[in-house]
Amino acid sequence: DQQRCIELLNVLADATSGQSEIFDSNIFSKLISNERGSLVIAEENKIILGMASISFNLALRYNGEYCQLEELVVDQDARGKNVGGLLIQEAINLAKKRGCKEFGLYLLESTKHNQPFYEKYGFVKIGAEMRQSL
């Protein structure tokens, strides 16, 4: 259910930036139909509890693709039930099946408290990221 996923993404935007964003359904459609990304959905009784979006990127340093976690969000009522863990595990499995050399993610200042969660699934901190808004 695209609408439910967009609702969850807006919850994530509010939690990470303090601003509620309206995600573009056209971008969502491109993500699920494009070979450069994928969505992993967790549902129970046809209710979406959470989602993870991942992108697949080419890099010379890997002589192939690597995977990037773009968003991971779990409904407030489903937290503490390992939904996030199951989403991460499935995203990692998708990346492995695709032949990705590495799986990465970024922790923002507002999400760095999640570092122990990701460490449970084998992620290690490797440095700082730099960015420029365009």
Show the residue positions of the predicted features.
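Conserved GNAT acetyl-CoA-binding A-motif
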Residues: 88, 95-107
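Conserved acetyl-CoA binding element of GNAT-fold acetyltransferases
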Residues: 64-76, 128
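Conserved acetyl-CoA-binding loop-helix of GNAT-fold acetyltransferases
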Residues: 71-74, 80-93, 120
